[in-house]
C-alpha cells in the first residue's frame, strides 16, 4: 500500500496525527517550493478568547524559489517564547498539561535553524506521547499533485489554512463530521478547557487533544481519520 504523502506541519492538527495513527509509514514533502499561508508554519490552539493562531516567522534564503527543506527560522522577535506563554495560558488548566509540558517547552526553546527540523522534533514528540508507531521519511524528489488528487496525496488537505478549521470553507455534514475536499473527517468531541464557553472546537493542534485526554487520546485519533 502506498504510504500517505503529507506536507510538514507545525504542531500538527488532530486530523494530521490521526492519519499517522492509522498507517505504518508516511512520507513528508520537503522538495516543494514553500507555499505561503499554510499550517506548515502555523498552528491553532483554543484560548479563553477563542481560537488563536500561532505563526512561526520564516526566512526564504532563495526568495520565492526556496524549497521547504531550505526554509529557516527568524528569531528577530522571540516568537518561541510568545508561543510557549500562549500555550501555558491556554492549557495550564488542562488535566494532563503538567505531564507533557516540560519536553514540549524544551523543543520550542532549542532555537532550531530550519523549520523542517523544528517540525520534525515536534512531530516525533507527539508520536511518542500518543504512542503511535509510524515511520517518517522525506521525499527525494518533488511530484506535482495530480487532478483529481490521489487519495494518498494529503499535502494540501491537511495543511491548507482554508480547509483545516471548521469555520474556514468546510462543509459540515453532521454535528461532528466535516468534509475537506474529497475527504470526510469525523471529529468525536472530547472535553476541552473552554468548551463551556465556545462548545467543542474540532481539529485544533494535536496538543489540544494531548493535554485534555492524555493517554486516552489515541482511541479518539483512530476514530477521526478516513480510511485511505
Residue ranges and their predicted role:
Residues 1-228:
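Residues lining hydrophobic/aromatic ligand-binding pockets adjacent to catalytic sites
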Amino acid at each position: 500500500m502506498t504510504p500517505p504523502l503529507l506536507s510538514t506541519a507545525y504542531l500538527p492538527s488532530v486530523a494530521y496525527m490521526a492519519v499517522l495513527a492509522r498507517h505504518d509509514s508516511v512520507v513528508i514533502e520537503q522538495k516543494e517550493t514553500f507555499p505561503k499561508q499554510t499550517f506548515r508554519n502555523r498552528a491553532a490552539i483554543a484560548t479563553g478568547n477563542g481560537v488563536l493562531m500561532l505563526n512561526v516567522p520564516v526566512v526564504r534564503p532563495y526568495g520565492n524559489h526556496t524549497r521547504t527543506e531550505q526554509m529557516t527560522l527568524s528569531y528577530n522577535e522571540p516568537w518561541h517564547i510568545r508561543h510557549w506563554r500562549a500555550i501555558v495560558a491556554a492549557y495550564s488548566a488542562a488535566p494532563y498539561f503538567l505531564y507533557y509540558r516540560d519536553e514540549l517547552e524544551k523543543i520550542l526553546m532549542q532555537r532550531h535553524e530550519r523549520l523542517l527540523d523544528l517540525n520534525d522534533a515536534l512531530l516525533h514528540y507527539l508520536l511518542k506521547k500518543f504512542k503511535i508507531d509510524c515511520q517518517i521519511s522525506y521525499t527525494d524528489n518533488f511530484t506535482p499533485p495530480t487532478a483529481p488528487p490521489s487519495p494518498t496525496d494529503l499535502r494540501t488537505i491537511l495543511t491548507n489554512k482554508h480547509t483545516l478549521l471548521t469555520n474556514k470553507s468546510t462543509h459540515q455534514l453532521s454535528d461532528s463530521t466535516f468534509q475537506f475536499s474529497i475527504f470526510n473527517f469525523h471529529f468525536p468531541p472530547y472535553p476541552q478547557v473552554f468548551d463551556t464557553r465556545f462548545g467543542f472546537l474540532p481539529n485544533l493542534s494535536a496538543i489540544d487533544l494531548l493535554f485534555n485526554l492524555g493517554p486516552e487520546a489515541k482511541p479518539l485519533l483512530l476514530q477521526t481519520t478516513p480510511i485511505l
